[in-house]
A protein has these predicted regions:
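Extracellular polysaccharide-recognition and catalytic grooves
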Residues: 252-365
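A short beta-strand element within beta-rich, extracytoplasmic domains
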Residues: 1, 7-10
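Residue-level recognition of short, structured coil/turn motifs
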Residues: 14, 181, 246, 290-291, ...
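Solenoid-repeat scaffolds in large eukaryotic assemblies
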Residues: 2, 45, 185-189, 294-298, ...
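Intrinsic-disorder/low-complexity, polar/charged segments
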Residues: 13-14, 85, 234, 289-291, ...
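Extracellular glycan-targeting catalytic surfaces
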Residues: 12, 18-270, 276-283, 303, ...
Length: 365
């Protein structure tokens, strides 16, 4: 007879049993934890932690296409196996070095909204400024050999760079956590996400001129295109560590960042490669929020969803019809992120359309 059940049955009244409900969950958790440890089943241990800390015990029963995740148990097993190979060890070492370098600088999220990448260039030489962590208000051009000071657009673009570097940092930590299981990488993501969650909702919607507008403007960035690119990867990092977050931390991150970001993007209709990236961000946020209605918008919405855009913008020869190789592979990346995100919901987008987009350009047609 399980220990948790014996403890619960010792209560003589319904009220006592109710009051012992917390301990019932605790003993159930410990019994299952011991069982899964004996079985060596890391996948079930992750699900158990997510169920216990979220209070949603139905998670334990979810299998296959019934869950919300970016990496299946098989994916995680493959990542960990690959990380032990000769080439895998090199990748892990590279990621570890990048995370180590990032942690030499401030990890605090900027208090202000970010700007536009196109503003991070010298007005004389059209050369991108050299990013320096300790110079948020002085942007250096190596061709001029001078600092440009007093231009708000340049300084807001510096914040853009910080946000993007933070995205890369959390994405790198995500793969290190999945590959090694080391809790420190989950903690790195947790700390930064909580910081963003505490600031994101308070940022105002703006464009590159710092004007509040719903014409493709963002919050962390000056345009929604950057917003969705950021959300696509950060939502993945969040879901990777969600099983080790407390219920309060999940609530803070979802209400402070994920939900406001989804609300913003649901009201940013665009077209062509922009909307393909919008759908990538919405699909990722929908999975992270476990919200099929958001996923449905990204995939099926008339004039804006994944299927509509494929029909409108994919030529019969496999190319996306925006007139250049760059604007073929750039939106293709978004389509791949979208297809991968929605696999867990039984939505199969790795089909002939995606196949053609890879194969036909290689043929030189």
């Amino acid at each position: 007879e399980p220990l948790w059940y014996a403890k619960w049955m010792q209560a003589s009244t319904t009220r006592e049993k109710y009051n012992r409900g917390y301990w019932l969950q605790f003993y159930l958790y410990k019994d299952l934890e011991n069982l899964f440890i004996r079985q060596g089943d890391e996948a079930k241990l992750r699900l158990l932690n997510q169920a216990y800390y979220s209070g949603d015990w139905s998670i334990i029963a979810k299998k296959g296409n019934e869950g919300f995740y970016f990496f299946s148990d098989e994916d995680v097993a493959a990542i960990r196996s690959s990380a032990k190979t000769q080439w895998g060890k090199k990748i892990i070492a590279d990621l570890e070095q990048k995370v180590k370098e990032r942690r030499k600088h401030s990890l605090e999220v900027p208090k202000e909204e970010g700007g536009h990448f196109h503003d991070y260039f010298c007005p004389v030489h059209n050369l991108q400024f050299t990013f320096r962590w300790d110079k948020p208000l002085a942007q250096y051009c190596s061709a001029c050999d001078k600092e440009w000071i007093g231009n708000n657009r340049y300084d807001w673009a510096w914040i853009y760079e910080v946000h993007m570097l933070n995205r890369d940092y959390m994405y790198q930590c995500m793969y290190l956590y999945l590959a090694t299981g080391k809790r420190q990488y989950a903690d790195y993501i947790r700390t930064m996400l909580l910081d963003y969650a505490g600031k994101y909702a308070g940022w105002f919607e703006h464009n590159s001129g710092r004007k509040a507008t719903d014409q493709h403007s963002g919050k962390a960035f000056a345009q929604s295109l950057d917003e969705v690119n950021w959300a696509t990867k950060v939502a993945m990092a969040y879901m990777a560590i969600k099983p080790v977050l407390s219920k309060e931390e999940v609530k803070t991150i979802e209400e402070g960042y994920l939900q406001p970001a989804a609300t913003l993007l649901l009201h940013r209709p665009a077209g062509a490669n922009w909307q393909m990236w919008h759908n990538s961000g919405l699909a990722a946020l929908g999975i992270a929020l476990e919200n099929d209605s958001i996923v449905d918008v990204a995939i099926n919405k008339d004039k804006y969803g994944y299927h509509y855009l494929i029909g409108k913008h994919k030529n019969s020869d496999g190319w996306i019809n925006e007139g250049s190789p760059h604007y073929h592979y750039y939106p293709l990346e978004a389509l791949l992120f979208t297809a991968n995100a929605v696999k867990c919901r039984g939505i199969k987008l790795f089909d002939k359309d995606l196949h053609d987009m890879f194969v036909e350009p290689v043929k030189g047609t």
